[in-house]
């Protein structure tokens, strides 16, 4: 066992040789390296697999032995200061290592086909491998300085990956936005690290926890300063994990390739903030104000993310806001003291969200030949629909990921989310009500995305899509209400030109006749090239892209079992609790792992009922075209209200839609207050500099010039004249001094 722990340093550095090899290959033999670029996938996957094998081995030993291991090397700078660096292996490290390596392997295999035609193929794999190295280095760090170093490397890799297609202005702006937003958190993290070093004199976790806890209990440190330092550490996690109010970078990060979105949203960047909170939780637990703040930020984020996901048209942005909401659940859990539930949901959500993002990549891959390669078209759910026939495997995997995120048993997220909901009732009923209500919203927006993508018929055919922003599909409301022909207006969904049918209309002017099915029986798209017509069909992805989806399906189905209690010698225990036993004992020495199955069943029925209600409402509004028309009278019986009641209902729907589609106006607020405010301040500073500062300096120079020009005519060039003037002035000064001195005496 000791031998295995000593060589755990291999885990973070295993993927690094691949990145270095690509760099050397492109530098020394660029032509050969580019010609053999598809062969580079194998070493990248192989090296990350080595790290995965080490991680699994360490995890098995920890489950059996329940030990924490730390190996350090001392670096002496001078006689008064030495820095120790090394690796820390505990349950949190092993969980994160397995998560990063397994998701990373799936994403790398998937990317081989997804990025095969991209000119930046090698650059993409180099960035991905270095990102895995940075994240693995972060989770194995033994002190705050190492964490900060790898924290910055993770941020740099995310910047490079988000802006991978840097020639696109939107991608360039997105990576800059992510970078600048995370600078706020990184600056706070650095100040917090320095503050705690000033308090405790140590960067090592165990020394830091013990010294700080003793100081707090003995009133040996100013509580306000300690709270401020802890808050600054938490600010770093808020920015990295896209928590309110530093969440604005997350939806724009979708400008990168889809495999990058899967990696960032599942196992790397957003997980880094959660990891930091989990790692430093012994610090936070002795400061009640910080624990309350963590839970409050988590609740705000989970509700805000869910509401912003309701009306998004971009499939990846919908999943991005879903990630934000689920990270709010994960952040809420440690804030209420539920350390186990936080890590459990981090695991289950990572695999489910990676499955959904890779599934969305398969969908986008099939839509691009039809609507074009612009993200505004290929990722727009308004143009999708009816893909079940052509993407059956992708559809099945996406459905399982959707149901898992909705919290439907026995899929993975059901077990973890239900545990967070149960624990939230013990902490605060208000937080619990918000969390449970958001679970219904989660089911609604996830099923909405699924139905718009796979159900019914290909929507592009109903809109006579022309590929321009003036196409009629922009006048269709996803809320079932006919809207104006503006991009930011209300968007309906199910209409047939020229007769429009609304779920909120007073009467149905036209019924769908039986010939409609014949007219749209073929889901092909007709494109004209040089007076020739070519038919393009949606198609299922290649096996290289489907294999990772199937692998993630297995995780989504079975990874929840690690947290299900089982009977072991008369006591109920689960693998995750046994895995986390040292950490749980460190945080809660008297923790009880017994399970009340009756209470669990009651709470599960309640949470599943909320999810089913959300699924039902989504199916009511976004079901297939045939079922929508067949049930139109039924739907209208609910939503058709006479006079002022209907107007009031429409206004509520418009407010919800505008709030969601415009991202809660938070981006507008930041743009107005910060971007425009800073530009206005810069213009004012420029004006003051040019008019005031430069005016004073230039004015003195001009005054000297004119004075010199005026007095140069006084002199005639005769020395006697200069002496006369000189003596005259001296005489005048002497007279003034004489009269002033004597007048002062007498």
Swiss-Prot record:
* Chemical reaction(s) catalysed: a plastoquinone + NADH + (n+1) H(+)(in) = a plastoquinol + NAD(+) + n H(+)(out); a plastoquinone + NADPH + (n+1) H(+)(in) = a plastoquinol + NADP(+) + n H(+)(out)
A Gene Ontology cellular component where this protein is annotated is: chloroplast thylakoid membrane
Where does the record say this protein resides? Plastid, Chloroplast thylakoid membrane
Q: Which Gene3D superfamilies match?
A: 1.20.5.2700
Bilayer topology reads: Multi-pass membrane protein
Keyword vocabulary terms for this entry: Chloroplast, Membrane, NAD, NADP, Plastid, Plastoquinone, Quinone, Thylakoid, Translocase, Transmembrane, Transmembrane helix, Transport
Molecular-function annotations in GO: NADH dehydrogenase (ubiquinone) activity; quinone binding
The UniProt entry lists the main location of this chain as: plastid
What's its EC?
7.1.1.-
Enzyme class, UniProt record, top EC level? translocase
Keyword Transmembrane helix in annotation: yes
Quaternary structure per UniProt? NDH is composed of at least 16 different subunits, 5 of which are encoded in the nucleus.
Q: What does this protein do?
A: NDH shuttles electrons from NAD(P)H:plastoquinone, via FMN and iron-sulfur (Fe-S) centers, to quinones in the photosynthetic chain and possibly in a chloroplast respiratory chain. The immediate electron acceptor for the enzyme in this species is believed to be plastoquinone. Couples the redox reaction to proton translocation, and thus conserves the redox energy in a proton gradient.
Could you identify this protein by its name? Answer: NAD(P)H-quinone oxidoreductase subunit 5, chloroplastic
